[in-house]
Amino acid sequence: MRRRMFLSRSSILAGVGLLALAGCEPPWRSRGEGPDASTSAASGGAGSGSASASASGSAGASGGSGQGVTRTVTTVGATLEVTVGPAVVSDDVMVVPLVVHLVKAGSSSPSTPGFSPHLVWNGTGSFTGADGVRLVDFDAGTVQETFKASSESTGLSEEEPDATLHALFKPVDAKTINVLVPESGLFEGVPVVRDGKLSDEAKKALEYVNTTENTPDPVALETFTASVDGASDTRVADKSVVINLASDVLFASDSADLSSQADATLKKAADQLATYPGGEVSIVGHTDDVADDAHNLDLSKRRATSVSDRLGQLTNMSAFSVSTDGKGESTPRVPNDSDGNRQLNRRVEITLVPTQAASSTSSPDASKGTGQGGGDLPQAEGPVAKGSEGVTVTRGNSEDKMTFVLTEVTRRGTYLVGEVKATGGTGGTQTGPADWLQPTQLDGSARGEEDNNLLGAVTGLSLLTPQTRYYPVDYTVAEGTHHPLSEITANNKLTAGDATTLTVVWPDTGQDTVTLDLQPAEHSTPSPN
């Protein structure tokens, strides 16, 4: 049960992609051929209205010096004209106004009839307003959440179609900012004004504010990728790289002798390390909680040594300071409460703290252009269609259906920004889009972290290459878990024909064609240790 979309791109990728949905439940895939970067492309999907995209990015956005950036968007069934900015710095706060005009009401709004943006833009806290808005700096590779929340309630209707909300951030030094608005898209190049002159509405918003539990300072974006064969995954953070190797691929049960399949996985890890000029490498073995502590500790240490020895044979490690250790069952990645989780905990973890950045940031498939080199993509377990055409998914044996259309993918520095339109099928949906678009093997984040704040998040949409699955970029929040740079609260039901806008940011795969995929659930009973 996998759905898949494909999209051709150069500087901008507009949605003429291919989407493949697996039959009865959400997994799927999509891909396609996009226009030349110098052209503009109209995009739209069932029930989504229309939007436009230019080579400069900012789909449907307009704005100039000192002006806000305007987009016409589809948000939980409603068609809205949203103007973001200009942002105004006043003392210790930067106020980002969001002026919204209701063009057409849908029937999916959490406050029908009409539309209440404060119920969609308010983030995961207990506030009403625009607490869920975030700032993205693609050049610096950072994201910033609000640090204060203004409790603003808005009810838009035909009689009163206009309102203004305010997102409150710590001030930034930049002249312009990129503003990610929940289920409304990315607003790029919003001007920042430093004269401290706030509107009367902004002053009123600042009269009743609360400090949030968000991450108010800019925090580095990280990448999380997994090998298509499930043998490894990689986390790239600001100062370290962590490669997790699945012990079930490297070793037989209760053994520290490398298997015949281990070299393929270890060679990929060696190639990753070889892109760095040097640094400190620690190799640590981990087990599940089957068998006693002493046995698991010894096994984990011997496995770490085996991996270290073989890596030294596969690549020149002289530029690295290498250490090995074992933790047994003491530091599980996820709770040892299921066979699937125990499998995740059986691993050898390679942590690199490099002396400087990698010599190449390209993906293993970057030189392949179309993304079809270096092997074939995994077989889709459902239909395949162009991203602009969309794929309709049915959940289980129910009549609950949703159509997903990949409307645009744009390169921004070393990132890809994608927009997906989700539209309710006949009879509408029983759950919001996020419930369809979460990892099917892991609870919480794509990394396997448990976080109740991600129950409504879009965490499972990945870009697929023959070798690697690229999950949405993410960042560490105050609680210590990772939140994706995608929708966090896309949990509103969609009635028939109503659509909403989902924005997802991935690391650049370095290819001319991207494949959007949602992996299927896998049921296995792996061996212990």
Each language-model region and where it sits:
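N-terminal export leaders
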Residues: 3-12
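The feature marks short-to-medium sequence segments in extracytoplasmic or secretory-pathway proteins
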Residues: 103-158, 268, 272, 412, ...
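Surface-exposed edge beta-strand/loop patches
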Residues: 27, 67-69, 155-220, 354, ...
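Periplasmic peptidoglycan-binding/anchoring modules of Gram-negative envelope and division proteins
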Residues: 227-239, 250-284, 308, 312-313, ...
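Short, low-complexity, disordered segments immediately C-terminal to signal peptides
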Residues: 25-61
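Periplasmic OmpA-like peptidoglycan-binding domain that tethers envelope proteins to the cell wall
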Residues: 286-364, 370
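Short, well-ordered beta-strand segments enriched in hydrophobic/aromatic residues
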Residues: 94-102, 416-424
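C-terminal motif of bacterial Sec signal peptides marking the signal peptidase cleavage site
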Residues: 21-23
